[in-house]
């Protein structure tokens, strides 16, 4: 007989990657963070819970994937798609990508919960959840439904982005939720030309990530440079490990190492 598992809420360490607004590179960070952790030797899963803008399938080059669904009696389990050593599930596998989803909060939150619970994960160490941007009903319901290990907040250095990121961090740390903030990732910290890796141009200001980490008494996990090749690679389904500019690989390896260390500290 074949036994189909669903993930017990205590079998893996679920980590939300969140932002207060769109456009800060949250999904790109989540996608590359998951690959970096997997390359460190851990069994890693990535849940694309960005329900209104699922972009992980495109970033991993698996847009046309069709996850297998196995039914045993009354129970159905979805087999995740594996790419770059990461087991991936996304709402994008099950909806027409040419149509926009118009779901109310409870329906959207329930869809995220089903992705999380009804998938055959099998021996996962870390689960990265690419969380919808914002601080509304979907976010609150999902946080309450899932047994989270912690959240990582993605922001860019400028104040307008930091203001929204603060709202996201405050949501996680309310008395009703009390989800630990495992750290801040400052994305697009500076621009570095591929032919001049030692040069830094601070296009969006400087020091925002440090400032926010201090405000919330948490860690600045790292600063990710703005590298044009990252966006171009994502459009082709490639990760940071498929390009020449190694400064961004160094940044993500540092972030992953610090994040995993911080998880041990809050355990």
Q: What residue ranges belong to the model's regions?
A:
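Residue-level signature of catalytic and energy-coupling elements of molecular machines
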Residues: 22, 56, 89, 112, ...
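Phosphate-binding loop that captures ATP/GTP phosphates
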Residues: 43-98
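Conserved catalytic-core segment of NTP-binding enzymes
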Residues: 125-126, 132-232
């Amino acid at each position: 007989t074949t036994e189909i598992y669903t993930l017990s809420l205590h079998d893996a360490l679920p980590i939300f990657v969140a932002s207060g607004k769109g456009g800060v590179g949250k999904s790109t960070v989540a996608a590359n963070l998951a690959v970096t952790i997997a390359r460190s030797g851990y069994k890693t899963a990535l849940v694309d819970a960005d329900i209104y803008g699922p972009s992980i399938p495109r970033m991993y080059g698996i847009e046309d994937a069709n996850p297998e669904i196995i039914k045993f009696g009354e129970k159905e389990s979805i087999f995740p798609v594996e790419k770059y050593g990461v087991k991936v599930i996304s709402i994008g596998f099950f909806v027409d990508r040419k149509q926009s989803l118009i779901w109310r909060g409870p329906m959207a939150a329930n869809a995220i919960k089903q992705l999380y619970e009804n998938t055959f994960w099998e021996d996962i160490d870390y689960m990265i959840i690419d969380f919808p941007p914002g601080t509304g009903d979907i976010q609150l319901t999902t946080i309450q439904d899932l047994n989270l290990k912690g959240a990582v907040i993605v922001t860019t250095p400028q104040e307008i982005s930091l203001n929204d990121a603060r709202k996201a961090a405050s949501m996680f740390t309310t008395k009703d939720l009390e989800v630990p903030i495992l750290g801040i990732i400052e994305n697009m910290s500076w621009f570095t030309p591929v032919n001049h890796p030692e040069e830094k141009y601070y296009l969006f200001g400087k020091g925002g990530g440090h400032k926010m980490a201090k405000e919330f008494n948490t860690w600045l996990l790292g600063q990710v440079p703005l590298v044009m090749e990252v966006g171009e690679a994502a459009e082709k389904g490639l990760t940071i490990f498929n390009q020449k500019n190694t400064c961004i690989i160094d940044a993500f390896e540092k972030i992953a190492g610090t994040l995993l260390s911080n998880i041990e500290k809050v355990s």
